[in-house]
Amino acid sequence: MIKYFTIYNWLFLLIILVTSSCQSKKTPKYILAPFSNLDTLSTNDWWNRKTSPIIDMKVPRDQVIAFGIYTTSNNTLKLSAQLFPLYPEESRKVKLAFYQNNIWKVVQTEQVNEIGWSVLFRIENFDMSKDIRYKIMHGETAYFEGLIRKDPINKAQITLAALSCNSNKDRGDRDEYVKNINTLNPDLIFFAGDQSYDHKEHTAAWLKFGLQFRELFRGRPCITIPDDHDIGQGNLWGEGGKKSLRKDGNDGGYFFHPEYVKMVERAQTAHLPDPYHKEALNQGI
């Protein structure tokens, strides 16, 4: 009787172990977002969301790098790569390569931030006196190529194209804007705010913005600064990073979770030259 009881116990334990193993394989691991009801199209188990009217997140895997955006200043290159959300089993490593001596040479490898899906490359002692081709790479097939322009110090005047308020009432392309601006060939692009009007879905809206305008900054430096709608409120009076108690932001500060605000800032400003004031403000913003 003891013998049979022992065998049955072992069989029962084996079934439990096999079942647990199967369940663990069926439950993908992901980094839990530090906020709720925000950026839902891009966080947690994003692949289970319904198709968004903003942009389709489930792109072919050779297209997961949406765009790169950069500035150069004081011999420092800062380049951000924006990715579409990655599946749990996909690599989080992104590479930056320069085209030198007729070959692509990887100069830096960085880890993508799963909250917002952006990654920053920083190259110091960068030679700003000449053009250089760059390539951002993920996995075996995904890449985005562009050109880092030399510093136009030999020009008496530099030209800047300034844009703002990219309405979400029209989610179509911006081909005519891009064509006309590229014809003028400015030295610098400046987006002055409200790149997104989708208050609670910044990553999706930022990806949409990038696909609409990336041919402007694929081959020239670009400044982007967030405004009120980018961080999800009607007005933005920063007031040192204080917590706003009103959705419109009219009492000053930031209404949404500070990690959401920081995600927006990371996506839109990480590639900008180093700030004069580097210390974090209230709420870590």
Placement of each model-derived feature along the sequence:
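Bacterial N-terminal signal peptides that target proteins for export
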Residues: 1-10
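Hydrophobic helical h-region of N-terminal Sec-dependent signal peptides
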Residues: 11-16
